[in-house]
């Protein structure tokens, strides 16, 4: 567990397992609601059993990755961070693996010059349409208002099994973790006091 420091307000959290010999490094690119936890366990263990390694990392704004709140966490920034991470850690013999929109980010990293021996797309949509644009814009708005915790809580019933939801419930649906809402309430409360 490490971080790549970009500056005093920005850093990228990552977990790296080195491959053996000529093994590949699988670079896992999260979904918007993802985290390194999605890749550890079954997936990570299976890859390392074959002598390969992996890099799992969190985008700025996801768990343990700090970011300047004035930054626009958009596609260009996320793809640039992926390229920077691969360059700084000097990975060779990589295979990019993108989950959901992470597949788009991995594809765009290839367009920016990242050298990869393969590209694996998991649940990545091929065509943008009105429905997908609506969902993506809503997800961004939810993240802006309540942070990634609220975004995760909104999406879990759609992407997880009922038994998994039951296991997650004690650590989910906790409004204390909706950071942006608290900041908004603080500003609103201060504003109302000024009007009294």
Spans of features found by a protein language model:
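Gly/Ala-rich beta-loop-alpha elbow adjacent to hydrolase catalytic centers
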Residues: 98, 102
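N-terminal cap/lid segment of alpha/beta-hydrolase-fold proteins
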Residues: 1-11
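Flexible "cap/lid" loop of the alpha/beta hydrolase fold
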Residues: 107-111, 117-146
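Conserved HGGG/HGGXW glycine-rich cap/lid loop of the alpha/beta-hydrolase fold
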Residues: 10-67
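Active-site loop/oxyanion-hole signature of alpha/beta-hydrolase fold enzymes
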Residues: 53-97
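Helix-loop "lid/cap" segments that line or gate small-molecule binding pockets
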Residues: 142, 153-166, 177-178
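Hydrophobic alpha-helical segments, chiefly the membrane-spanning helices
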Residues: 191-196
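Conserved small/polar residues in nucleotide/adenosyl-binding loops
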Residues: 179-186
């Amino acid at each position: 567990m490490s971080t790549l420091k970009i500056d005093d307000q920005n850093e990228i959290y990552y977990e790296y397992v080195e491959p053996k010999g000529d093994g590949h490094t699988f670079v896992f690119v999260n979904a918007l609601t993802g985290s390194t936890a999605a890749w550890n366990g079954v997936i990570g263990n299976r890859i390392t059993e074959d002598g390969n390694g992996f890099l799992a990392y969190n985008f700025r704004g996801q768990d343990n990755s700090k970011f300047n709140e004035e930054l626009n966490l958009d596609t260009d920034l996320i793809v640039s961070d992926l390229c920077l991470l691969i360059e700084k850690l000097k990975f060779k013999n990589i295979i990019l693996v993108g989950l959901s929109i992470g597949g788009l980010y991995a594809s765009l990293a290839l367009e920016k010059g990242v050298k990869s021996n393969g590209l694996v797309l998991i649940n990545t949509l091929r065509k943008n349409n009105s429905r997908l644009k609506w969902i993506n814009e809503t997800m961004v708005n939810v993240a802006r208002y309540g942070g990634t915790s609220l975004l995760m809580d909104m999406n879990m019933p759609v992407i997880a099994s009922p038994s998994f939801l039951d296991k997650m419930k004690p650590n989910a649906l906790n409004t204390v973790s909706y950071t942006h809402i608290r900041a908004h309430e603080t500003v609103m409360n201060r504003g109302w006091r000024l009007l009294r």
